[in-house]
Amino acid sequence: MKQSINIQDQFLNQLRKENTFVTLYLLNGFQLRGLIKGFDNFTVLLETEGKQQLIYKHAISTFVPQKNVSIELE
């Protein structure tokens, strides 16, 4: 049986590995900008100006990277 592809994990991992600057839009409209330093099933660790913020994924609406991210869909 073929393993299902987890696009979210691939996307976040590429952002982390390539140190791609990202803007996070929260559900309340607030914007956070920085680098993804890590993530798990429930949270994203964002670093902004040397400070870390742990954001719960359920509070995030959208990730907007500064440049396009390459992921494998097959």
Swiss-Prot record:
Domain spans labelled Sm: 9-69
Molecular function via GO: RNA binding
Keywords recorded for this protein, A-Z: RNA-binding, Stress response
GO biological process, one term: regulation of translation, ncRNA-mediated
Subunit structure and binding partners: Homohexamer.
Family annotation (Pfam families): Hfq (PF17209)
Cellular component terms per the entry's GO annotation: cytosol
Organism taxonomic ancestry: Bacteria, Bacillati, Bacillota, Bacilli, Bacillales
UniProt-listed InterPro entries: Hfq (IPR005001), LSM_dom_sf (IPR010920), Sm (IPR047575)
Family: Belongs to the Hfq family.
Nucleotide-binding in keyword set: no
Name of the protein: RNA-binding protein Hfq
Source organism of this protein record: Bacillus cereus (strain ATCC 14579 / DSM 31 / CCUG 7414 / JCM 2152 / NBRC 15305 / NCIMB 9373 / NCTC 2599 / NRRL B-3711)
Annotated function: RNA chaperone that binds small regulatory RNA (sRNAs) and mRNAs to facilitate mRNA translational regulation in response to envelope stress, environmental stress and changes in metabolite concentrations. Also binds with high specificity to tRNAs.
CDD domains from the UniProt entry: Hfq
